[in-house]
């Protein structure tokens, strides 16, 4: 084994080793999820060298410099205010979802008008209209980090795969017997998972365009699904009050997470795949040990349905959004509520962190989106201007651009 080079990963902090083994180029990641501006760097370097034979004494200084760079990035204070850059009269009918590519150079909007549109973020110009679905385009995603493909899931029961560069349709995946409402690419960008109102999830092979697996076992609609960071697990959240954990590529169901007393609205893995967070209409969020499928915490406090849940990029914070008009931030390790985000005058349907983990963005039926400090719960900015409910919002990876999608048929770019 021979170390070729180091690559830095800012969020979540880590160093990627590129090395040669038996003539093949391979990579492995050293996660530094606990790194903070006050961490003793020499100690971290020492621990890395003990654990990683590829990093020899001659590389010590280099590794130290990399960690100092990560530390500097984490410590950067962000007092940015966002301003409205463009209003895109995106579709003739309401939007369903918005999503960025990894670099944030382009984003996509899905709509009830049966299309998905690709936009250039810098100019606000429309690049492509992806046409071909025969009903609402509901679930949309880029194959990040690559960003060269787009998947669309529709109420017409099909999923389509498109070229992000040309807008050409590569495949139409047929097999579901009801609406597709959620989808995800695996991290390797070799599979697409789709979740449907027909109670099943399906996996599709991107290369061949064939169905690879059907995951059956839920007793009601699948409303949420996501892969873990390595792509060997998939979770599906259902209206049957449960979440299933599936082994990929075998399709074996490893665990059924039972305990919620209402429909699941969202289910997510944390970065190191040790925890699963689930949000439910029973007003609670639960944390589960992903290895044994046991519930390790029930995060309470909301007075109405929990509509969304998300981890920050390191997996140390959990944020929930509720129909009670508040959001909450919990510590994943202590399970305590760290901050209550109060100020919206309507339900919050969407919540997300920026990649840096120092900002939270919420979308609400009160026609505003808000920016928050996750540690103090302080509202830093209210993004006003939409004339109807905002149900989708996203940060780009750099954290310097925001998109919001509303029932007013427009999409707004803020930066």
From Swiss-Prot:
It comes from Xenopus tropicalis. GO terms for biological process: intraciliary transport; outer dynein arm assembly. Transmembrane segments: none annotated. CDD domains: WD40 (cd00200). WD repeats lie at residues 90-129, 132-174, 175-214, 217-256, 259-298, 301-340, 343-384, 386-415. One of its GO terms (cellular component) is cytoplasm. Its main location: cytoplasm. The keyword Membrane does not apply. Gene3D superfamilies: YVTN repeat-like/Quinoprotein amine dehydrogenase. Pfam families: WD40. It comes from the Eukaryota. InterPro entries: G-protein_beta_WD-40_rep, WD40/YVTN_repeat-like_dom_sf, WD40_repeat_CS, WD40_repeat_dom_sf, WD40_rpt. Belongs to the WD repeat WDR69 family. Keywords: Cell projection, Cilium, Cytoplasm, Cytoskeleton, Flagellum, Repeat, WD repeat. It is found in: Cytoplasm, Cytoskeleton, Flagellum basal body; Cytoplasm, Cytoskeleton, Flagellum axoneme. This is Dynein assembly factor with WD repeat domains 1. Required for axonemal dynein assembly and ciliary motility in ciliated organs, including Kupffer's vesicle, during embryogenesis. Facilitates the onset of robust cilia motility during development.
């Amino acid at each position: 084994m021979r170390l070729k080079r180091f690559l830095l990963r800012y969020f979540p902090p880590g160093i990627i080793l590129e090395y040669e083994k038996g003539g093949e180029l391979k990579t492995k990641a050293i996660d530094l999820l606990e790194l903070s501006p006050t961490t003793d760097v020499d100690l971290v370097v020492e621990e890395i060298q003990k654990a990683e034979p590829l990093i020899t004494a001659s590389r010590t200084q280099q590794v130290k410099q990399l960690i100092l760079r990560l530390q500097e990035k984490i410590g950067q204070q962000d007092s940015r205010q966002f301003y409205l850059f463009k209003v895109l009269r995106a579709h003739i009918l309401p939007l369903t979802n918005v999503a960025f590519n990894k670099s944030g150079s382009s984003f996509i909007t899905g709509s009830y008008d049966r299309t998905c549109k690709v936009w250039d973020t810098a100019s606000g110009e429309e690049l492509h209209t992806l046409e071909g679905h025969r009903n609402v385009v509901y679930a949309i995603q880029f194959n990040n980090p690559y960003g060269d493909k787009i998947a669309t899931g529709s109420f017409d029961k099909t999923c389509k795969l498109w070229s992000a560069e040309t807008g050409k349709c590569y495949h139409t995946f047929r097999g579901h017997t009801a609406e597709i409402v959620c989808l995800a690419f695996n991290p390797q960008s070799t599979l697409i998972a789709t979740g449907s109102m027909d109670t099943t999830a399906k996996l599709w092979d991107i290369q061949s365009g064939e169905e690879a697996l059907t995951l059956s076992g839920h007793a009601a609609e699948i409303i949420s699904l996501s892969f873990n960071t390595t792509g060997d697990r998939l979770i599906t959240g259902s209206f049957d009050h449960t979440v299933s954990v599936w082994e990929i590529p075998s399709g074996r169901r490893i665990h059924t997470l039972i305990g919620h007393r209402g429909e699941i609205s969202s289910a997510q893995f944390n970065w190191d795949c040790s925890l699963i967070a689930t949000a439910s209409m029973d007003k609670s969020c639960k944390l589960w040990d992903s290895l044994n499928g046991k519930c390790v915490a029930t995060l309470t406090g909301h007075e109405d349905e929990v509509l969304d849940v998300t981890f920050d990029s390191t997996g140390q914070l959990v944020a929930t959004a509720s129909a009670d008009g508040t959001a909450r931030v919990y510590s994943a390790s202590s399970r305590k509520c760290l901050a209550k985000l109060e100020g919206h005058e309507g339900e919050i349907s969407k919540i997300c962190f920026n990649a840096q983990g120092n900002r939270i963005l919420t979308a609400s039926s009160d026609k505003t989106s808000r920016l928050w400090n996750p540690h103090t719960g302080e509202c830093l900015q209210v993004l006003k201007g939409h004339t109807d409910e905002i149900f989708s919002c996203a940060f780009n990876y750099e954290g310097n651009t925001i998109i919001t999608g509303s029932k007013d048929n427009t999409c707004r770019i803020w930066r």
